[in-house]
């Protein structure tokens, strides 16, 4: 070994110290030492620096041995790019230097080359020769360049508020969601097999006179439902039917589980009461451990997505629903909930109820019967060269959802005319103004500009939906405004149809809400439109 040094250490001393931390004197750790010292020498004196390593192997230990940067204090970041490189940089400005092991400089170093490029199998590597080559090569096989670290890396993210996970009851960062990451399945441990209560089972021939512990489901070609209900006494006449259902042994209520377990019917009732909000109802009699939610009125279904995801992360609990923002009919089912096992652990039930304690999962909002006006723009229509077909199309959609059309008008593609007509319709009492066409990039299309002249504010122009990408939303005073692009004339369903129910329900719409429409926002333009019984808008 030569007399090269790594910082304050001889190579032998460094290898001994490295072995104490790393477990053995790894070649990558020795190279990491040379790389750290080279990077330090290239920084201005007195620089308060932080470090980035581009591989999780060996390099982080070299940085932690030779600097005050560590994973624990947040000054060492491991960004696994698979490259044997590191960077030291000014923690405030981000200006720094990157050092890497340069494969182009290894022709004279066969042991290093075989190790780095994995052309020499590990069992054939001569560790003594390899370490000797690394010691003699030192920084001569390294290259470096100036780098500027991205602002997003310099930004120090605060952990934020700490919450107690409703499942495991341990503290965790609230930013991770409603349940800690360990309880979402990211824990690196084998999950224990789910435990359950000891239940009383009897052979079918011995079940006569016993009380059924749960609904026993019968499935035929035409129906599915309970043949024997929970709490029902099993009679001799039931045995053949139960055998035909494949029942040879049945659960009976001879042994009641202890207080740590909750029967599916009791558990699902507790969950349903916590989930149902305004405009939602459900039967107080569970069927097969399940409860179905119904709309108590015609309206817009609102599902709290964060709560929905979190409650489904609680073990042994499930709830499934139709999509949020769909128009639902009174007395039609839209969601169902049930525990997975016959008896739900009280801890799981408590966790689910804790998730649901802040707000209801489901609401059905009333659709307001807004007094509406329709403003058609287009010189060709105003002059009678083209017959208007927009008014009946838009009017039908408004009236279908309970709105009334109090006035209509047709004006040319003229900013002043559009602004004046807008004001007339608002003065006539319009609570919702729907304009048609004039929203594209053509120079004659000035509908948006005319609306702005009339006082349009809170403007959202454009949505990731096809058809209907050039939809416009906004308000003039207390009057809400929706601009329908020309595609609304030939396409049966557009972005207007997705958003009109939200407007009528008084739901605030922001840019993020529009962005979320992109997933499912491509209409297949079927010859026979079946919306909303299709994927569009979902």
Model-predicted regions and their roles:
Residues 1-25, 32-194:
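Non-transmembrane, aqueous-exposed alpha-helical and coiled segments at domain scale
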Residues 16-25, 259, 320, 485-488:
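A short glycine/serine-rich beta->alpha loop
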Residues 51, 372-374, 481:
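Conserved hydrophobic helix-helix packing surfaces used for dimerization/oligomerization
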Residues 171, 176-177, 181-196, 222-223, ...:
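Cysteine-cluster motifs in flexible loop/terminal segments that predominantly coordinate metals
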Residues 195-288:
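Short, low-complexity N-terminal leaders and the immediately following helix N-cap/first helix
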Residues 254-367:
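Extended, charged alpha/beta regions that create polyanion-binding interfaces
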Residues 359-413:
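Glycine-rich phosphate/diphosphate-binding loop of Rossmann-like nucleotide-binding domains
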Residues 379, 389, 406-537:
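Short glycine/threonine-rich loop/turn motifs
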């Amino acid at each position: 070994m030569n007399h090269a040094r790594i910082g304050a250490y001889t190579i032998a001393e460094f290898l001994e110290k490295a072995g104490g931390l790393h477990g053995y004197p790894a070649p990558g750790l020795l190279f990491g030492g040379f790389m750290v010292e080279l990077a330090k020498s290239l920084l201005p004196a007195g620089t308060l620096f932080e470090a980035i390593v581009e591989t999780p192997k060996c390099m982080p230990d070299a940085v932690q041995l030779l600097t005050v940067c560590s994973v624990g204090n947040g000054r060492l970041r491991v960004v696994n790019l698979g490259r044997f490189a590191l960077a030291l940089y000014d923690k405030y400005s981000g200006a720094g230097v990157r050092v890497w092991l340069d494969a182009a400089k290894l022709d004279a170093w066969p042991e290093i080359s075989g190790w780095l490029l994995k052309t020499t199998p590990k069992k054939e590597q001569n560790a003594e020769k390899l370490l000797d080559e690394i010691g003699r090569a030192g920084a001569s096989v390294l290259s470096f360049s100036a780098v500027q670290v991205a602002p997003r890396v310099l930004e120090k993210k605060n952990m934020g508020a700490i919450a107690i996970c409703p499942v495991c009851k341990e503290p965790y960062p609230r930013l991770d969601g409603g349940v800690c990451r360990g309880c979402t399945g990211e824990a690196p441990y084998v999950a224990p097999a789910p435990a359950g209560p000891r239940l009383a089972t009897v052979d079918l021939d011995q079940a006569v006179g016993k009380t059924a512990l749960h609904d026993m489901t019968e499935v035929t070609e035409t129906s599915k439902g309970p043949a024997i209900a929970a709490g029902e006494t099993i009679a001799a006449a039931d045995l053949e039917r139960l055998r035909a259902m494949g029942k040879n042994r049945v659960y009976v209520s001879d042994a009641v589980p202890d207080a740590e377990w909750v029967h599916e019917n009791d558990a699902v009732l507790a969950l349903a009461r916590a989930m149902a909000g305004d405009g939602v109802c459900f039967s107080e009699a569970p069927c097969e451990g399940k409860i179905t939610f119904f709309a108590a009125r015609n309206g817009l279904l609102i599902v709290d997505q964060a709560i929905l995801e979190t409650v489904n992360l609680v073990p042994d609990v499930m709830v499934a629903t139709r999509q949020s923002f769909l128009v639902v009919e009174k007395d039609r089912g839209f969601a169902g909930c049930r525990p997975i096992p016959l008896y739900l652990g009280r801890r799981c039930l408590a966790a689910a109820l804790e998730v649901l304690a802040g707000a209801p999962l489901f609401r059905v909002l009333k659709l307001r019967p807004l007094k509406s006006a329709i403003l058609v723009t287009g010189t060709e229509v105003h002059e009678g060269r083209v017959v208007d077909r927009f008014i009946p199309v838009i009017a039908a959609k408004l009236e279908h959802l309970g709105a009334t059309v109090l006035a209509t008008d047709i004006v040319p593609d003229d900013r002043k005319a559009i602004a004046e007509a807008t004001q007339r319709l608002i003065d006539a009492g319009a609570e919702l103004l729907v304009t048609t066409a004039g929203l594209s990039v053509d120079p004659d299309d000035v509908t948006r500009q005319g609306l702005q002249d009339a006082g349009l504010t809170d403007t959202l122009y454009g949505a990731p939906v096809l058809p209907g990408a050039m939809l416009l939303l906004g308000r003039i005073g207390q009057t809400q405004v929706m601009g329908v692009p020309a595609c609304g004339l030939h396409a049966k369903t557009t972005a207007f149809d997705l958003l009109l129910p939200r407007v009528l329900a008084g739901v605030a719409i922001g840019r993020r809400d529009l962005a979320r429409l992109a997933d499912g926002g491509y209409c297949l333009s079927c010859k026979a439109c079946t919306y909303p019984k299709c994927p569009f808008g979902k």
